Amino acid sequence: MLPSLQSLTKKVLAGQCVPTNQHYLLKCYDLWWHDGPITFDHNLKLIKSAGIKEGLDLNTALVKAVRENNYNLIKLFAEWGANINYGLVSVNTEHTWDLCRELGAKETLNEEEILQIFIDLKFHKTSSNIILCHEVFSNNPILQKVNNIKMRIEIFWELRELIEKTDLLNNEFSLSTLLLKYWYAIAIRYNLKEAIQYFYQKYTHLNTWRLTCALCFNNVFDLHEAYEKDKIHMDIEEMMRIACIKDHNLSTMYYCYVLGGNINQAMLTSIQYYNIENMFFCMDLGADAFEEGTIALGEGYKLIKNILSLKIYSPATTPLPKSTDPEIIDHALKNYVSKNMMIFLTYDLR
């Protein structure tokens, strides 16, 4: 839709750095949202306010305004270029529905359009965005129009390590439960602290899921927060197994090792999942499950069997700090290079 002169003026004003003593002007122009001034980043097309400091893209901001039945902002965001059809996924009153139609929205969205809006809205990995996505799509009847398998494919792709190597997200869960676990997992994967706390406070029955995601996605900071502060515990060997299912998970593996996890079992798990960097890291920490690892592989896996057959490995001579402090672990492992991996890579196999 063509913007009015007034909306263009507001757009320019929202892009300015307005002094605090002139915020009353922004209130007069309805550039006020969640107890703070609305600002608009023209380059990134991000809407920000006191309640959404990380920002929402224009279409997502429209979805939020529609959900809140904020008619002034719905009109404003539509005039600024937001796709009014996006509002149809969060519309919840007849009056707002009528307004969206007046602004050019379609009568209904088809399956492909709904799925594309879902994909677009979940793209930005910020706390504000993930919380909004959860609120919009939780038990949303519009998702009934989308093929269940297509929705699951979109969810499973980002959580494929958990899907492939655990049974935690099998088909017995409803789509609503699956989506809830998905948003929680994304918050942990990208260490979105505000979103993590939102889900933790609201869904205490998913505490084990939080710990599992922190282990799998190598988020040693939230792992420590959950384990030490919030006292979310599980068997240490199961924790180590989950940490080993994804390669390069050195931080959460080491955390479990310091807690007393069996490093030989961790080496075996890493071998079974063909996670070579994890395997070498276990060797650095003193693991020596070479024969057991070769047997566990069975047929095939020539490369890893060749690695295990060599008698050239030994524990790292420079010990890592025995601490569960996530800052210390992160600092120690940020640029970590496995001693035993380097030995193998420089070994003359001829």
From Swiss-Prot:
Swiss-Prot/TrEMBL keywords: ANK repeat
Domain of life, per lineage: Viruses
Pfam families given in the database record: ASFV_360
InterPro entries, per database record: ASFV_MGF360 (IPR002595)
Gene Ontology biological process terms in this record: taxis
Record carries keyword Electron transport: no
Positions of ANK repeats: 57-89
Sequence similarity: Belongs to the asfivirus MGF 360 family.
Function according to Swiss-Prot or TrEMBL: Plays a role in virus cell tropism, and may be required for efficient virus replication in macrophages.
Name recorded for this polypeptide: Protein MGF 360-12L
Source organism (scientific name): African swine fever virus (isolate Tick/South Africa/Pretoriuskop Pr4/1996) (ASFV)
